[in-house]
Each structure stands twice: as structure tokens, then as C-alpha cells.
Amino acid sequence: MNDITKRPSGRTADQLRDVRITRHYTKHAEGSVLVEFGDTKVICTASIAESVPAFLRDRGQGWLTAEYGMLPRATHTRSDREAARGKQTGRTQEIQRLIGRALRSVFDLERLGARTLHIDCDVIQADGGTRTASITGAFVAARDAVAKLLATGRIETSPITDYVAAISVGVFDGIPVLDLDYDEDSQCDTDMNVVMTGDGGFVEIQGTAEGVPFSRDEMNKLLDLAQAGIATLIAKQKEALESKGE
């Protein structure tokens, strides 16, 4: 795509931010990752519990669940901790459910056995795309946690059936663009989050017009951008998992 845009970052329409995935970022979790989409930075951990929720007892399968949060000063101005307010915001609940759905789409939960994989995504710096970065990083953390289950003989076969990653797209300055940062997200005409698997299947598409409706042609262009961007992200995941320390 050669469309000329006036993106605040100076990126071309189809250009991702610099993406980095750092494994084994914290000491205690079975899987831990620092994922960076430009200036957006998220710590993703995967922890194993040898139990399942009550609704899955005696069912012979496991569960994967996710939680999401932001440090008070992850954004331009400080926000109170949700624990101090006594409740999670609707946004937080929506995002952590999305992360859980995205990862469960590539898990065979029966192979996991009667245990739970807890995914925690904590945003330490936000510049747009925190939910998509969380999904992309959390998958790598989950892979490392599963590798430990395999290495210790607690499971015989990996429950992971494919890769999964996510990216944002939108219409900015009249042009479909990939991987919106905060400045673009706050000014765009359309904002869309797309989750896809390694084999090209769609897990979730969240799209909203921010005042100016988008056409079917624009939606198709956005999905094409997202598909190409996610293919690059999955290549980054594979590169990280193949790096020393796997």
C-alpha cells in the first residue's frame, strides 16, 4: 500500500510500530513476557494452578482465564487503581474477556487436564493498542507455561493448536491504516481490533465508526491490513520462541 498519510508517527499506512517480545521477563511465573508495540509496553504472565473453576469440576478438562490492568501512570495523566475504587471498569472487563477468548480459541482444554492457566496482562505504559499487544504477548507467555507442563511430564501433548495474535486498524485522515497509536486512535474515523490465528482464521473483529460510517470497501481494506499485520506479528512470536532459552 502506497497511500500517503499524515500519520503523527510518520509511518506509512501499512507499517507496524517497532515490535519487541522479550521472554522470561519476570522470575516466578511459568511464562512471562514484556511485549512492546512502539511505546505501548505490557507485561504478560502465564501461571499454572492445579485446579479448575467449580463449573468444570469432574469434567476432565482445564480452563484458561485472563485478567488485565494498567498501572496508575501508564497513561498521560494518573488514574486511580481500580482496587482503590472497589470495582473494575467496564473497559477492563471487556478487554480481559477478549484476551481470554482469544487464547482459548487456540487451546484444546481437554489436553490441558484439570488445571487452570491464569493470564495476567499489566500495562506499564500505554500508547494505543494495549489489548492487541496483550493478546500477542500473552500467547508467547502461555506457550512457555505449556512447555514447562510438557517438560515436567504433567501433560503428554501440547494443548496449543495454533498461534494467535491481534492488531488494531482504522481509518485515519481518510486512509485505512495499521496499528494505531494513541494520537491516531483519538482522532480516527474508524477504529477496529482484529484477532486472527496462524492459519488465517478470524477469532474476533471489533469495529466502530467514530462519527463517520465506514463502507464495505473500507472494511475489506482494513481486514486486509490486519491480516498482513498479524502475519508479521506471528512471525515475531515464532522468532521469540525460537530464540535462545526456548
UniProtKB/Swiss-Prot annotation:
InterPro entries of this UniProt entry? ExoRNase_PH_dom1, ExoRNase_PH_dom2, ExoRNase_PH_dom2_sf, PNPase/RNase_PH_dom_sf, Ribosomal_Su5_D2-typ_SF, RNase_PH, RNase_PH_bac-type, RNase_PH_CS
Q: Mind telling me which SUPFAM superfamilies this protein's record contains?
A: Ribonuclease PH domain 2-like, Ribosomal protein S5 domain 2-like
- Residues recorded as binding phosphate, renumbered to this chain, are R91, G129, T130, R131
Tell me what reaction this enzyme catalyses.
Answer: tRNA(n+1) + phosphate = tRNA(n) + a ribonucleoside 5'-diphosphate
An example Gene Ontology biological process: tRNA processing
HAMAP family (UniProt xref): RNase_PH (MF_00564)
The entry sums up its family as follows: Belongs to the RNase PH family.
Q: What does this protein do?
A: Phosphorolytic 3'-5' exoribonuclease that plays an important role in tRNA 3'-end maturation. Removes nucleotide residues following the 3'-CCA terminus of tRNAs; can also add nucleotides to the ends of RNA molecules by using nucleoside diphosphates as substrates, but this may not be physiologically important. Probably plays a role in initiation of 16S rRNA degradation (leading to ribosome degradation) during starvation.
Cite the record's note on assembly. Homohexameric ring arranged as a trimer of dimers.
Protein name in UniProt: Ribonuclease PH
Biological source species: Paraburkholderia phymatum (strain DSM 17167 / CIP 108236 / LMG 21445 / STM815) (Burkholderia phymatum)
* Highest classification ranks of the organism: Bacteria, Pseudomonadati, Pseudomonadota, Betaproteobacteria, Burkholderiales
